[in-house]
A protein has these predicted regions:
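Acidic/polar-rich alpha-helix caps and helix-coil junctions
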Residues: 1-59, 94, 98-321
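Short, cationic low-complexity segments
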Residues: 60-86, 137-143
Length: 321
């Protein structure tokens, strides 16, 4: 995929598509630790708690930094969703991505995955019988009101540690079947198989449509105006199909750590991040001096000690450093 070897990538996904892996029926249940190593998870870092390891260091140490605050969690507050990401979940009257960066309002129709992925003010948080509040967020005025939700384990769960180091037993997913479907759809578009790509993306969207939606605290109604539909019109334009696949990748994999690397792989990191910063600077003052330098910021520098420690000339520094 990173080398643009589309036929090889397409062929490589065939064996996985024909295997015993598959999509979990419910999107929300995919991220419950009691469902670790389910049929969708292909490769994951295994985590556990209360297993005799000192300080519970087999737990999800990284995920503890996501803890959103409030009455049930510590307030580390890292990996905060941006307003731009929240807006990406807005949909049209037809239930398809609106591709709008206008700030979401309460009555807007939204993809139901938003409230499984992101903590939003006045939306129930997990199964805790409480509404997420903006003031849970660390440094609200600087970083905004939204918090992570997808990989946060309920404080009611026996797989969540309520004392230091506040870790959980939720495995860290490296590759899941949903992403393989997205890979295959991407390769299919580049190979001109647009209708197959549409059907693949519809598999992802159909799972989201048929999953349980977040409800109001009394369980009587959906917590927001959820709408999601399949792509019903055949795809005939490669550029439009490519954009649809990339958008679906962003929504399905949000906050799972893939977005930046996908932007680099697609060769659009400079444009997307620069456009993002132009608007997001007006929303978040800590970004006022942020910028993206093309042909540099796509990659981190190679440690000089590594370059100096091997045969001279064998490794050269990345561009711009």
């Amino acid at each position: 995929m990173f080398q643009g070897e589309w036929q090889l990538a397409y062929d490589a996904t065939t064996a996985v598509m024909n295997s015993n892996y598959g999509l979990m029926d419910d999107f929300q249940e995919l991220f419950l630790p009691e469902n670790d190593n389910n049929k969708e998870v292909i490769f994951a870092v295994q985590q556990s708690i209360n297993d005799g390891q000192p300080s519970n260091y087999n737990g999800s140490i990284g995920d503890r930094l996501l803890a959103p605050g409030g009455p049930f969690y510590a307030q580390y507050g890292f990996h905060r969703p941006s307003q731009n990401l929240v807006n990406a979940f807005k949909v049209t009257a037809e239930g398809l991505p609106a591709n709008s960066n206008e700030n979401l309002i309460d009555t807007d129709p939204v993809d139901p995955r938003i409230d499984i992925t992101i903590g939003r003010p006045d939306i129930p948080y997990k199964d805790l019988d409480i509404l997420y509040q903006a003031d849970w967020a660390r440094d609200l005025a600087t970083y905004g009101a939204f918090g992570p939700k997808k990989r946060i384990v309920s404080a009611n769960s026996p797989y969540h540690l309520e004392v230091w180091p506040y870790v959980s037993a939720l495995n860290y997913y490296i590759i899941r079947f949903g992403e393989v479907i997205l890979w295959r759809a991407e390769a299919a578009v580049e190979l001109g198989k647009l209708e197959e790509a549409r059907q693949l993306i519809n598999q992802i969207r159909e799972r989201a449509k048929n999953s349980a939606y977040v409800k109001t605290l009394d369980g009587s109604n959906d917590a927001a105006n959820y709408e999601i539909e399949l792509y019903k019109t055949p795809w005939t334009d490669k550029s439009v199909a490519r954009d649809a696949v990339r958008t679906e990748s962003r929504l399905e994999l949000a906050l799972e750590g893939h977005r930046f690397f996908n932007l680099v792989r697609w060769g659009i990191a400079d444009k997307v991040i620069s456009d993002y910063l132009e608007v997001e600077k007006t929303r978040r003052t800590h970004l006022s001096n942020a910028s993206f330098t093309s042909d540099k910021n796509e990659y981190m520098p190679i440690p000089q000690a590594y370059i100096d420690g091997i045969e001279k000339g064998l490794v050269t520094q990345n561009k711009g450093y």
